[in-house]
Design a protein with these regions (language model features):
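Short juxtamembrane and helix-loop transition motifs at transmembrane-helix boundaries
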Residues: 110-120, 137-147, 200-205, 229-241, ...
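Localized chelating/binding microdomains
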Residues: 129, 133, 217, 221-224
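Interfacial loop-to-helix transition and helix-capping segments at the boundaries
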Residues: 17-18, 42-54, 143-157, 194-222, ...
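Alpha-helical transmembrane segments of multi-pass integral membrane proteins
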Residues: 220, 224, 247-357
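Residue-level recognition of alpha-helix termini/interfacial anchor residues
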Residues: 176, 216, 229, 238-241, ...
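Membrane-cytosol interface segments of multi-pass membrane proteins
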Residues: 1-195, 301, 306-309, 324-372
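Structural signal for the C-terminal ends of transmembrane alpha-helices
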Residues: 65-74, 112-113, 167-173, 224-235, ...
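Signature aromatic-anchored transmembrane alpha helix within multi-pass, membrane-resident enzymes
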Residues: 180-187, 239-257
C-alpha cells in the first residue's frame, strides 16, 4: 500500500470509525467558523446559525456511552453501579484535564492583560475564584462563574447529563435505549424549540436550567436511541446497490446539515437538523455505507484527534482579536484568527503530549515519612 493511499485507507487495524473521526473534525471546523462571527457583519457571518454543530458531539457521545455500557455488561463487572458510574465519568473527564488546565491558564493571562486596569485587587481575587468553577466543570450547573472560555460549556453540560443517564441506561438496559431515551429526546427537543432561549446562548437560564444543559440531555438521549437503531439495522444483510445509495445519502445529508447552518435561522429548522444529524450518525455507525472503506487512513484519524485541541483552544484567538481591535480588513483578521487557532491548538497539543511522556517516564513518587 502506497504512503499516499495509507493517508486515507488503512488495513483496518484501527477500531475507530474513520468516518466519525473525519466528521469530528468537520463539525469542529464548523464551530470554529461560527465563533469567527465577531469579526464580520451580521449579513456576512460564516455558518451564523451553526450552534447545533455541538449536537453532533453530544449524539456521538450518547452512542459511545451505551457502547461502553454494553462492554461493562459483557465483562460482568462486580463493582456497584455508583462506583461504575464514577469510574466512567472519571475516564471521560481525566483525559480532558490537561487541556482544561492549559486553556484555563491561557484565559486567565489574556483576560488579565486586557482588563486588569478596570479591576480592583478584590475584584481580581473574586475573578480568579469564580473562574475556578469553569475549570471544575460547574459552569452549566447554574452556579455563576467567571467565563474564561466560552466554548467549554459543552464539556460541563455533557458530564452533568451523563451523571444520571449512565446509571439509568445501565440499570434499565433496552427499556432505556428503546423507550425512555427516545421519548426524553423528542420531548426535550420539542421544549427547546418552544422556549425563548436561543441555541446561540447556551448559558441562557430557563425553567429547566441552562439551555445548554437541556440540549446535552436531549442530544445524549438521542445518541442512546441511535445505538438501538444501529443494533436493529446491523441484523440485516444489504445489497451493494443499496449500500452505494446510502453512501450518497450519507454524504449529501451531512452537506445539507452544514449548509443549513448558513441559511436557516429558525429554531424549528435547527431542531429538524438535529434529527437529521442523529439519523446520519446512525447510518455512519451502522456500517451500511462504503464511507469507512475510504475514510480510515492515518490522515483521517489525525484530523479526528486534532479536533479536540482545536475545539478547546480556538476560542483563545477569538478573545485576543476581540480585545486587540486591530485596524485591519476583515479578511486579514479572519486569516489571523484561523492561522492563530491552528497554531495555538497544535502547540498546546504538543505541550500536553510532551508532559504526558515526561510524567510517564518520571512519575511523581510520594515518600513514606514513616520510613525516614
Amino acid at each position: 500500500m502506497s504512503r499516499l493511499r495509507q493517508l486515507f485507507v488503512s488495513d483496518g487495524a484501527n477500531r475507530k470509525n474513520g468516518m466519525i473521526e473525519f466528521l469530528r473534525f468537520v463539525f469542529c471546523v464548523a464551530v470554529v467558523l461560527l465563533h469567527s462571527g465577531v469579526l464580520f457583519s451580521e449579513q456576512s457571518k460564516p455558518l451564523k446559525y451553526g450552534s447545533y454543530a455541538v449536537e453532533f458531539f453530544f449524539i456521538v457521545s450518547g452512542y459511545l456511552m451505551i457502547k461502553s455500557i454494553k462492554k461493562a455488561e459483557s465483562a460482568e463487572l462486580k463493582t456497584s453501579l455508583g462506583r461504575e458510574t464514577c469510574a466512567f465519568l472519571r475516564h471521560k473527564f481525566c483525559p480532558l484535564m490537561p487541556y482544561l488546565i492549559l486553556v484555563f491558564i491561557y484565559g486567565l493571562i489574556i483576560h488579565y492583560i486586557f482588563i486588569r486596569d478596570s479591576l480592583e485587587y478584590t475584584d481580581t481575587y473574586a475573578y480568579f475564584i469564580t473562574s475556578l468553577g469553569e475549570l471544575l466543570g460547574l459552569r452549566m450547573t447554574g452556579l455563576k462563574v467567571q467565563v474564561l472560555n466560552g466554548n467549554i460549556w459543552y464539556i460541563s453540560a455533557m458530564l452533568i447529563a451523563m451523571l444520571p443517564l449512565y446509571p439509568l441506561a445501565r440499570k434499565l438496559g433496552d427499556r432505556f435505549t428503546h423507550i425512555i431515551a427516545p421519548f426524553t429526546a423528542v420531548m426535550l427537543i420539542g421544549w427547546i424549540s418552544r422556549c425563548d432561549a436561543k441555541l446561540e446562548t447556551p448559558g441562557a437560564w430557563t425553567s429547566l436550567g441552562h439551555i445548554g444543559t437541556v440540549r446535552a440531555f436531549a442530544a445524549l438521549c438521542l445518541g442512546c436511541a441511535v445505538f438501538a437503531v444501529v443494533e436493529a439495522v446491523n441484523e440485516r444483510p444489504y445489497k451493494r446497490w443499496f449500500r452505494a445509495t446510502m453512501t450518497v445519502v450519507e454524504w449529501v445529508g451531512y452537506a445539507v446539515v452544514i449548509a443549513t447552518m448558513q441559511f436557516a435561522g429558525k429554531k424549528s429548522v435547527q431542531m429538524m437538523m438535529i434529527y437529521l444529524t442523529a439519523a446520519l450518525v446512525a447510518l455512519t455507525f451502522s456500517g451500511i455505507t462504503y464511507s469507512q472503506r475510504f475514510m480510515s487512513g492515518k490522515l483521517v484519524y489525525a484530523l479526528g484527534k486534532f479536533s479536540l485541541p482545536l475545539y478547546i483552544f480556538h476560542y483563545i484567538m477569538r478573545y485576543t482579536l476581540q480585545y486587540l481591535k486591530l485596524d485591519l480588513p476583515t479578511e486579514q483578521q479572519f486569516a489571523i484568527y484561523i492561522g492563530g487557532a491552528l497554531a495555538v491548538s497544535a502547540l498546546s497539543e504538543a505541550v500536553i503530549r510532551f508532559l504526558r511522556v515526561f510524567y510517564t517516564k518520571h512519575p511523581l513518587r510520594v515518600t513514606d515519612i514513616s520510613t525516614q
